[in-house]
């Protein structure tokens, strides 16, 4: 097993880690049989086991096992199936850290939304960011396991543990990222470049070194995305 995957799985799965290692051993002995025997686990992780063309990896095993162990959850990019779905799943994950009850305070965030401008797929990134800010105050962080698919796979880690893995790539397939969003709109640098850079730093909390690199390019692609 890749050393980075091993370290992250140990931090993510905690007391379930040894069981995960046993599953990996069985998977590597006979992958086809393993997938057939654990079809429900893969389905809960939103993996299609019906096609023989699908090749699963140790990273896939970790993601699916984390979900059935309530260490991770998955949701479609377009939005919640029911109101409060994300809060409920994160509240469940916090119980792994002995937090039986977490008082969410997202009313200010909800009231600030202009629903006439919120398009399909816009709400979840904003919700994750608002919830992450509240969790950060208690020493925890939302962690995205980004597989470049049309869903969010998210977990909760103590912030001190998460920072060790932020922006780490596993198996050239999964990237561990935060839900922080940068919204940068820059049409014309003109003669006001220092003021623009200062504004971006204060407005969006983007590191100045990143802003300088961004503004130094001859051609700039603008958009909304995650922190990497």
Which sequence ranges carry the predicted segments?
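Generic preference for hydrophobic/aromatic residues in regular secondary structure cores
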Residues: 47, 61-63, 67, 75, ...
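Residues at alpha-helix termini
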Residues: 96, 137, 171, 202-203
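A short, ordered amphipathic alpha-helix with a cationic face
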Residues: 9-10, 153-154, 184-189
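Short glycine-rich, low-complexity/disordered patches
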Residues: 21-41, 102-118, 135-152, 179, ...
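Acidic, proline/glycine-rich low-complexity IDRs
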Residues: 1, 116-181
């Amino acid at each position: 097993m890749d050393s980075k995957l091993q370290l992250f799985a140990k931090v993510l799965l905690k007391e379930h880690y040894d069981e995960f290692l046993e599953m990996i051993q069985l998977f590597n002995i006979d992958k086809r049989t393993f997938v057939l025997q654990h079809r429900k686990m893969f389905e809960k992780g939103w993996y299609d086991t019906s096609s023989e063309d699908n090749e699963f990896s140790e990273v896939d095993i970790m993601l699916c096992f984390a979900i059935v162990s309530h260490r991770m959850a998955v949701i479609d990019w377009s939005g919640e199936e029911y109101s409060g779905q994300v809060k409920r799943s994160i509240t469940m994950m916090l119980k792994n850290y002995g937090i039986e009850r977490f008082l969410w305070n997202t009313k200010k965030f909800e009231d600030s939304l202009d629903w006439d401008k919120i398009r399909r797929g816009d709400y979840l990134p904003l919700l994750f960011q608002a919830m992450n800010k509240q969790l950060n105050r208690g020493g925890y962080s939302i962690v995205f396991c980004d597989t470049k698919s049309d869903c969010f796979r998210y977990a909760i880690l103590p912030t001190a543990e998460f920072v060790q893995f932020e922006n780490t790539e596993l198996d050239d397939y999964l990237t561990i990222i935060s839900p922080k969003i940068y919204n940068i709109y820059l049409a014309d640098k003109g003669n006001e470049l220092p003021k623009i850079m200062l504004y971006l730093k204060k407005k969006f909390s983007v590191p100045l070194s990143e802003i300088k690199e961004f503004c130094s390019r001859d051609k700039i692609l603008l958009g909304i995305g995650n922190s990497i």
